[in-house]
Amino acid sequence: KKERYILKKIWDIEKPIATIITLYPSTSDLIINDSTTTFITNNVFKCGFGGFYSVNLYSKISTGKREFGKQDTKVNDNYILKCAKISDNIIIACGSLPKTNKLVQNRLNSIIELLAKNKLRKKILFLTDSNKQDNFHPLAPKVRAKWEFM
């Protein structure tokens, strides 16, 4: 398996569902979780959600060097949009990489524009800490135990 578009974990359909947008997929699946998926699951549950769709700016599964510029993103965009439309909130959790990598910054901006074009802007939240200054990735020590949003 070279790409993953969605990882879906739903435990209570009566509660709100979130779409979490991170950078790229891990090797997690429905049963085996990596650290990122574990922190997402724990915090989504603590925030009162009934589950989540994990989607990524890039769909290629890779444990080595990231090749952000060499991926076709059209299919992935459709999956992101599909999940966003059926979710109560869209949580952007890409961390600081968009600040330091122009390709990633442009990709994130294009996803935000896509969501805005589809009238989903009001659903967007950014994962942050109590200072509400920066966007964090779920692995960041400051947000591992408690999520805040801006």
Model-derived segments and their meaning:
Residues 62, 68-150:
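Glycine/proline-rich loop-helix segments at beta-alpha junctions forming the active-site rim
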Residues 26-48:
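A short mixed-secondary-structure module that forms the rim of ligand-binding clefts
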Residues 24-27, 60, 97:
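A short, flexible beta-alpha/helix-coil linker loop
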Residues 50-66:
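Short connector loops at secondary-structure junctions
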Residues 17, 50-51, 89, 123:
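Residues at the starts of beta-strands that form the adenosine-phosphate
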Residues 1-34:
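Active-site and ligand/interface coordination hotspots across diverse enzymes
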